[in-house]
């Protein structure tokens, strides 16, 4: 899954990445995703088929035997969702979330991050974004830096000896 998400991100193929997230992470149906992404249900089905083939290929390359039918059915869908949630292969990096909060992402990235946060509701990324947007208590940050510097003074003195 990480390899698939990385390949889609590298190619800036956000349409397919949104479909992958919607299907494998959020467990959305083809029809629902088609409506949200303003695509035909056939387009979503075709992309889903290609994504499943790529996932199967990646698993085979990793040395595991798998059949194309493993990704169908309720149990497998739950397994994919759990794995996607655990690995978070399509979550934007904190730097990307920071740029999103500042409004300086390229339009295609901004659209993807908005989809990931607002439509899929990724709680991990929402928490990261909230942390990035939280006001900084400068007095607390200064006290923390001072404690850090005080705790390392002896270490650096010994390192030079």
Predicted regions mapped to residue ranges:
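Short, Lys/Arg-enriched N-terminal segment that forms or immediately precedes the first helix
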Residues: 1-8, 43, 78-83
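Short alpha-helix boundary/capping elements
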Residues: 24-29, 105, 121-124
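DNA-recognition helix of helix-turn-helix
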Residues: 31-64
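A short, amphipathic alpha-helical patch
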Residues: 48, 113-135
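C-terminal edge and immediately downstream basic/flexible tail or linker adjoining helix-turn-helix-like DNA-binding
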Residues: 52-95, 134-160
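Short, amphipathic alpha-helical interaction patch
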Residues: 80-118
């Amino acid at each position: 899954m990480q390899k698939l998400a990385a390949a889609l991100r590298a190619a800036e193929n956000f349409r397919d990445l949104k479909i992958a997230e919607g299907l494998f992470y959020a467990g959305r149906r083809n029809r629902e995703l088609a409506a949200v992404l303003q695509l035909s249900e056939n387009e979503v089905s075709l992309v889903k088929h290609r994504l499943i083939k790529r996932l199967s290929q990646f698993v085979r390359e990793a040395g595991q035997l798998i059949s194309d039918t493993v990704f169908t059915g309720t149990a497998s869908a739950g397994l994919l969702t759990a794995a996607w949630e655990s690995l978070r292969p399509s979550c934007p990096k904190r730097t990307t979330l920071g740029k999103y909060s500042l409004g300086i992402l390229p339009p295609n990235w901004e659209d993807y991050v908005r989809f990931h946060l607002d439509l899929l509701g990724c709680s991990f990324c929402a928490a990261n974004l909230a942390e990035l947007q939280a006001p900084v208590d400068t007095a607390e940050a200064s006290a923390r830096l001072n404690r850090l510097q005080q705790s390392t003074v002896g270490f650096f003195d010994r390192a030079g000896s």
